[in-house]
Regions:
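Acidic, histidine-bearing metal-coordination/catalytic regions of metal-dependent phosphoesterases
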Residues: 1-19
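Core catalytic region of metal-dependent phosphoesterases/phosphodiesterases
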Residues: 14, 18-24, 29-131
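Surface-exposed, flexible loop/turn segments at secondary-structure boundaries
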Residues: 29, 69, 102, 143, ...
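Membrane-proximal helix-turn-helix segments that form the acceptor-binding/catalytic region
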Residues: 86-87, 189, 233
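Conserved beta-sheet core of the metallophosphoesterase superfamily
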Residues: 113-125, 131-136, 141-162, 223-285
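Active-site-proximal loop/helix segment associated with metal-binding centers of metalloenzymes
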Residues: 140-229
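Short, solvent-exposed aromatic-acidic interface loops
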Residues: 285-294
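Glycine-rich phosphate-binding loops of NTPases
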Residues: 295-300
Protein backbone atom coordinates (compact mmCIF):
# COMPACT_ATOMS: atom_id res chain seq x y z
CA UNK A 1 0.00 0.00 0.00
CA UNK A 2 1.16 3.52 -0.68
CA UNK A 3 2.25 5.60 2.27
CA UNK A 4 -0.44 8.10 3.18
CA UNK A 5 0.18 11.74 4.03
CA UNK A 6 0.00 12.80 7.65
CA UNK A 7 -3.61 13.19 8.75
CA UNK A 8 -3.55 16.94 9.21
CA UNK A 9 -1.52 17.78 6.10
CA UNK A 10 -3.19 20.07 3.59
CA UNK A 11 -4.71 23.47 3.12
CA UNK A 12 -8.10 21.77 3.04
CA UNK A 13 -7.98 21.38 6.81
CA UNK A 14 -9.00 25.05 6.96
CA UNK A 15 -12.49 24.52 5.50
CA UNK A 16 -15.26 26.41 7.25
CA UNK A 17 -16.96 23.96 9.64
CA UNK A 18 -19.92 26.32 10.07
CA UNK A 19 -20.99 25.78 6.45
CA UNK A 20 -22.49 22.71 4.83
CA UNK A 21 -19.75 20.92 2.92
CA UNK A 22 -20.50 19.67 -0.60
CA UNK A 23 -18.18 16.98 -1.96
CA UNK A 24 -17.80 15.89 -5.58
CA UNK A 25 -15.17 13.85 -7.39
CA UNK A 26 -14.29 12.08 -10.59
CA UNK A 27 -15.48 14.57 -13.18
CA UNK A 28 -12.54 13.72 -15.48
CA UNK A 29 -12.73 17.07 -17.23
CA UNK A 30 -10.72 17.56 -20.41
CA UNK A 31 -9.98 20.29 -22.92
CA UNK A 32 -13.43 20.59 -24.55
CA UNK A 33 -12.52 18.22 -27.39
CA UNK A 34 -15.24 15.84 -28.65
CA UNK A 35 -14.86 13.10 -26.03
CA UNK A 36 -14.27 15.36 -23.07
CA UNK A 37 -16.52 13.92 -20.36
CA UNK A 38 -18.03 17.28 -19.44
CA UNK A 39 -18.99 17.93 -23.07
CA UNK A 40 -21.20 14.86 -23.23
CA UNK A 41 -24.98 14.97 -22.85
CA UNK A 42 -25.98 17.84 -20.55
CA UNK A 43 -23.20 17.46 -17.98
CA UNK A 44 -21.87 20.97 -18.42
CA UNK A 45 -25.25 22.53 -17.64
CA UNK A 46 -25.78 20.04 -14.78
CA UNK A 47 -22.51 21.09 -13.19
CA UNK A 48 -23.41 24.75 -13.64
CA UNK A 49 -26.75 24.29 -11.88
CA UNK A 50 -25.10 22.27 -9.10
CA UNK A 51 -22.57 25.04 -8.47
CA UNK A 52 -25.45 27.53 -8.29
CA UNK A 53 -27.06 25.30 -5.68
CA UNK A 54 -23.89 25.18 -3.57
CA UNK A 55 -23.62 28.97 -3.75
CA UNK A 56 -27.28 29.45 -2.83
CA UNK A 57 -26.83 27.16 0.18
CA UNK A 58 -23.71 29.10 1.18
CA UNK A 59 -21.82 25.84 1.08
CA UNK A 60 -18.15 24.93 1.03
CA UNK A 61 -17.20 22.94 -2.08
CA UNK A 62 -14.55 20.22 -1.82
CA UNK A 63 -13.38 18.26 -4.88
CA UNK A 64 -11.66 15.02 -3.91
CA UNK A 65 -9.79 13.92 -6.97
CA UNK A 66 -9.88 13.17 -10.67
CA UNK A 67 -11.42 16.55 -11.33
CA UNK A 68 -9.14 16.83 -14.37
CA UNK A 69 -8.38 14.00 -16.80
CA UNK A 70 -4.64 14.49 -17.19
CA UNK A 71 -3.82 10.94 -18.27
CA UNK A 72 -5.41 11.83 -21.60
CA UNK A 73 -5.48 15.61 -22.03
CA UNK A 74 -2.45 17.95 -21.95
CA UNK A 75 -2.57 20.13 -18.85
CA UNK A 76 -1.86 23.35 -20.76
CA UNK A 77 -4.84 22.72 -23.04
CA UNK A 78 -7.16 22.07 -20.10
CA UNK A 79 -6.04 25.21 -18.26
CA UNK A 80 -6.53 27.36 -21.36
CA UNK A 81 -9.91 25.97 -22.42
CA UNK A 82 -11.45 25.58 -18.97
CA UNK A 83 -10.48 28.99 -17.63
CA UNK A 84 -14.08 30.13 -17.09
CA UNK A 85 -14.87 27.10 -14.93
CA UNK A 86 -11.61 27.44 -12.98
CA UNK A 87 -12.36 31.14 -12.40
CA UNK A 88 -15.74 30.27 -10.94
CA UNK A 89 -14.37 27.54 -8.68
CA UNK A 90 -11.67 29.90 -7.44
CA UNK A 91 -14.32 32.51 -6.61
CA UNK A 92 -16.14 29.81 -4.60
CA UNK A 93 -12.99 29.17 -2.54
CA UNK A 94 -13.04 25.52 -3.59
CA UNK A 95 -10.76 23.03 -1.84
CA UNK A 96 -9.17 20.57 -4.28
CA UNK A 97 -7.55 17.24 -3.38
CA UNK A 98 -6.07 15.64 -6.54
CA UNK A 99 -6.51 11.95 -7.40
CA UNK A 100 -4.54 9.53 -9.53
CA UNK A 101 -5.75 11.00 -12.84
CA UNK A 102 -4.76 14.57 -11.93
CA UNK A 103 -1.92 13.99 -9.47
CA UNK A 104 0.43 16.14 -11.58
CA UNK A 105 -1.09 19.30 -10.09
CA UNK A 106 -0.28 18.41 -6.47
CA UNK A 107 3.10 20.09 -6.96
CA UNK A 108 1.30 23.42 -6.61
CA UNK A 109 0.23 22.58 -3.05
CA UNK A 110 3.53 23.92 -1.76
CA UNK A 111 3.91 26.97 -3.97
CA UNK A 112 2.74 30.55 -3.63
CA UNK A 113 2.55 31.11 -7.38
CA UNK A 114 0.21 28.53 -8.99
CA UNK A 115 -0.77 28.97 -12.68
CA UNK A 116 -4.36 29.82 -11.70
CA UNK A 117 -5.99 31.03 -8.45
CA UNK A 118 -8.09 27.84 -8.35
CA UNK A 119 -4.97 25.92 -7.36
CA UNK A 120 -4.29 28.19 -4.38
CA UNK A 121 -6.32 25.80 -2.20
CA UNK A 122 -5.02 22.56 -3.63
CA UNK A 123 -4.34 20.10 -0.85
CA UNK A 124 -3.05 16.69 0.09
CA UNK A 125 -5.57 14.36 1.76
CA UNK A 126 -6.58 15.86 5.08
CA UNK A 127 -8.59 15.31 8.25
CA UNK A 128 -11.14 17.84 9.46
CA UNK A 129 -13.12 17.79 12.71
CA UNK A 130 -16.84 18.27 11.96
CA UNK A 131 -19.57 17.70 14.53
CA UNK A 132 -17.13 16.13 16.96
CA UNK A 133 -15.82 13.49 14.54
CA UNK A 134 -12.71 13.29 12.36
CA UNK A 135 -13.48 13.29 8.65
CA UNK A 136 -10.77 12.10 6.27
CA UNK A 137 -11.07 13.74 2.83
CA UNK A 138 -9.13 11.76 0.23
CA UNK A 139 -9.52 10.53 -3.33
CA UNK A 140 -9.14 6.84 -2.52
CA UNK A 141 -6.30 5.68 -4.74
CA UNK A 142 -4.11 6.06 -1.66
CA UNK A 143 -5.43 2.73 -0.36
CA UNK A 144 -5.74 1.04 -3.76
CA UNK A 145 -2.82 -1.44 -4.03
CA UNK A 146 -3.28 -1.63 -7.79
CA UNK A 147 -3.02 2.13 -8.37
CA UNK A 148 0.74 1.82 -8.72
CA UNK A 149 3.38 3.60 -10.76
CA UNK A 150 3.43 0.94 -13.48
CA UNK A 151 -0.31 1.18 -14.08
CA UNK A 152 -0.16 4.96 -13.91
CA UNK A 153 2.60 5.22 -16.52
CA UNK A 154 0.87 2.77 -18.83
CA UNK A 155 -2.33 4.73 -18.34
CA UNK A 156 -0.58 7.83 -19.62
CA UNK A 157 0.48 6.01 -22.78
CA UNK A 158 -3.03 4.66 -23.34
CA UNK A 159 -4.51 8.07 -22.62
CA UNK A 160 -2.32 9.79 -25.18
CA UNK A 161 -3.25 7.17 -27.78
CA UNK A 162 -6.93 7.68 -26.96
CA UNK A 163 -6.49 11.45 -27.25
CA UNK A 164 -5.06 11.04 -30.75
CA UNK A 165 -7.91 8.71 -31.76
CA UNK A 166 -10.84 10.48 -30.15
CA UNK A 167 -11.56 12.80 -33.07
CA UNK A 168 -12.50 9.80 -35.18
CA UNK A 169 -16.29 9.94 -34.96
CA UNK A 170 -18.08 6.65 -34.34
CA UNK A 171 -14.91 4.73 -33.54
CA UNK A 172 -15.58 1.64 -31.42
CA UNK A 173 -12.86 2.17 -28.84
CA UNK A 174 -12.95 1.25 -25.18
CA UNK A 175 -12.47 4.39 -23.16
CA UNK A 176 -9.21 5.14 -21.38
CA UNK A 177 -11.15 4.88 -18.11
CA UNK A 178 -12.31 1.35 -18.95
CA UNK A 179 -8.87 0.09 -19.96
CA UNK A 180 -7.25 1.49 -16.82
CA UNK A 181 -9.97 -0.10 -14.69
CA UNK A 182 -9.20 -3.47 -16.23
CA UNK A 183 -5.48 -3.00 -15.67
CA UNK A 184 -5.98 -2.09 -12.03
CA UNK A 185 -7.99 -5.25 -11.41
CA UNK A 186 -5.70 -7.75 -13.10
CA UNK A 187 -2.33 -6.18 -12.29
CA UNK A 188 0.93 -7.37 -13.74
CA UNK A 189 -0.53 -10.29 -15.69
CA UNK A 190 -2.57 -7.97 -17.85
CA UNK A 191 0.48 -5.81 -18.50
CA UNK A 192 1.94 -8.73 -20.46
CA UNK A 193 -1.36 -9.30 -22.22
CA UNK A 194 -1.52 -5.61 -23.12
CA UNK A 195 1.85 -5.87 -24.92
CA UNK A 196 0.34 -8.52 -27.14
CA UNK A 197 -2.85 -6.51 -27.64
CA UNK A 198 -0.93 -3.54 -29.00
CA UNK A 199 -0.05 -5.55 -32.13
CA UNK A 200 -3.71 -5.78 -33.05
CA UNK A 201 -5.16 -2.82 -31.18
CA UNK A 202 -8.04 -1.84 -33.44
CA UNK A 203 -9.22 -5.39 -34.15
CA UNK A 204 -9.10 -6.43 -30.49
CA UNK A 205 -10.97 -3.36 -29.30
CA UNK A 206 -13.67 -3.71 -31.96
CA UNK A 207 -14.26 -7.30 -30.90
CA UNK A 208 -14.36 -6.30 -27.23
CA UNK A 209 -16.96 -3.65 -27.96
CA UNK A 210 -19.19 -6.24 -29.59
CA UNK A 211 -18.89 -8.81 -26.82
CA UNK A 212 -19.19 -6.77 -23.64
CA UNK A 213 -20.20 -3.10 -23.34
CA UNK A 214 -17.64 -0.83 -21.73
CA UNK A 215 -20.15 0.25 -19.08
CA UNK A 216 -20.63 -3.35 -17.94
CA UNK A 217 -16.86 -3.85 -17.68
CA UNK A 218 -16.55 -0.77 -15.51
CA UNK A 219 -19.41 -1.90 -13.25
CA UNK A 220 -17.94 -5.36 -12.63
CA UNK A 221 -14.37 -4.26 -12.01
CA UNK A 222 -15.25 -1.33 -9.76
CA UNK A 223 -17.55 -3.44 -7.58
CA UNK A 224 -14.75 -5.92 -6.90
CA UNK A 225 -12.25 -3.16 -6.19
CA UNK A 226 -14.64 -1.38 -3.82
CA UNK A 227 -14.97 -4.48 -1.66
CA UNK A 228 -11.21 -4.94 -1.49
CA UNK A 229 -10.59 -1.33 -0.61
CA UNK A 230 -13.24 -1.23 2.13
CA UNK A 231 -11.08 -3.61 4.15
CA UNK A 232 -8.16 -1.21 3.91
CA UNK A 233 -10.26 1.80 4.84
CA UNK A 234 -11.63 -0.03 7.85
CA UNK A 235 -8.16 -0.99 9.03
CA UNK A 236 -7.05 2.64 8.89
CA UNK A 237 -10.19 3.64 10.79
CA UNK A 238 -9.61 1.08 13.54
CA UNK A 239 -6.00 2.24 13.83
CA UNK A 240 -7.32 5.68 14.73
CA UNK A 241 -6.44 7.61 11.58
CA UNK A 242 -10.01 8.94 11.21
CA UNK A 243 -13.64 8.29 12.13
CA UNK A 244 -15.33 8.93 8.77
CA UNK A 245 -13.94 8.21 5.29
CA UNK A 246 -15.00 10.70 2.58
CA UNK A 247 -13.71 9.24 -0.68
CA UNK A 248 -14.22 8.85 -4.43
CA UNK A 249 -12.10 6.89 -6.94
CA UNK A 250 -14.40 3.91 -7.60
CA UNK A 251 -17.20 5.90 -9.30
CA UNK A 252 -19.71 4.11 -7.03
CA UNK A 253 -21.65 6.58 -4.90
CA UNK A 254 -23.00 5.21 -1.66
CA UNK A 255 -22.35 4.25 1.92
CA UNK A 256 -21.04 1.39 4.01
CA UNK A 257 -22.00 1.34 7.66
CA UNK A 258 -21.98 4.77 9.26
CA UNK A 259 -18.35 5.57 8.45
CA UNK A 260 -17.75 5.19 4.68
CA UNK A 261 -19.20 7.65 2.18
CA UNK A 262 -18.33 7.69 -1.52
CA UNK A 263 -19.02 10.75 -3.67
CA UNK A 264 -19.41 8.71 -6.86
CA UNK A 265 -18.68 10.47 -10.14
CA UNK A 266 -19.96 12.75 -12.89
CA UNK A 267 -19.17 10.33 -15.71
CA UNK A 268 -22.15 7.98 -15.70
CA UNK A 269 -25.91 8.17 -16.04
CA UNK A 270 -26.17 9.94 -12.68
CA UNK A 271 -24.07 12.72 -11.20
CA UNK A 272 -23.42 12.31 -7.49
CA UNK A 273 -22.35 14.34 -4.49
CA UNK A 274 -22.10 14.25 -0.70
CA UNK A 275 -23.46 16.84 1.71
CA UNK A 276 -22.02 17.15 5.23
CA UNK A 277 -23.88 19.34 7.71
CA UNK A 278 -22.07 21.38 10.38
CA UNK A 279 -23.29 18.72 12.87
CA UNK A 280 -21.45 16.01 10.94
CA UNK A 281 -24.42 14.29 9.28
CA UNK A 282 -23.57 12.96 5.81
CA UNK A 283 -25.99 12.45 2.93
CA UNK A 284 -25.40 10.89 -0.49
CA UNK A 285 -27.30 12.48 -3.37
CA UNK A 286 -27.73 12.41 -7.12
CA UNK A 287 -27.98 15.74 -8.91
CA UNK A 288 -31.00 15.07 -11.14
CA UNK A 289 -33.05 17.61 -13.11
CA UNK A 290 -31.20 20.39 -11.29
CA UNK A 291 -32.30 19.24 -7.83
CA UNK A 292 -30.78 16.87 -5.25
CA UNK A 293 -32.28 13.39 -5.02
CA UNK A 294 -31.32 11.00 -2.17
CA UNK A 295 -29.06 8.09 -3.13
CA UNK A 296 -29.43 5.20 -0.68
CA UNK A 297 -26.98 2.82 -2.32
CA UNK A 298 -25.04 0.49 -0.03
CA UNK A 299 -21.79 -0.19 -1.86
CA UNK A 300 -21.06 -3.67 -0.47
Amino acid sequence: MKAQPSCEVGKGSGINQNKPVYVISDLHIGDRSPRDNLCRANRESLLDSFLHHVENQKGQLVIIGDFLELLRYPLDNVLARRKTLLDRLADMDTVYVPGNHDEDVIRWADTTNPPHPFFARISHAFVRHIGGRRFKFMHGHEVDPLANAGIQNLGRVIGRLAYLCEFRQGACLLSNDTVIGLLEETGEQLLHVWTWLLAGLHTALRESCGRLPAGRIRFLTRRIRTQRMLTRYYRDKTEGLYDIAIVGHTHRAGTFGDWYFNSGSWTGARSNFLRITPDGDVGVFNWTDNVPQPNRTVVA
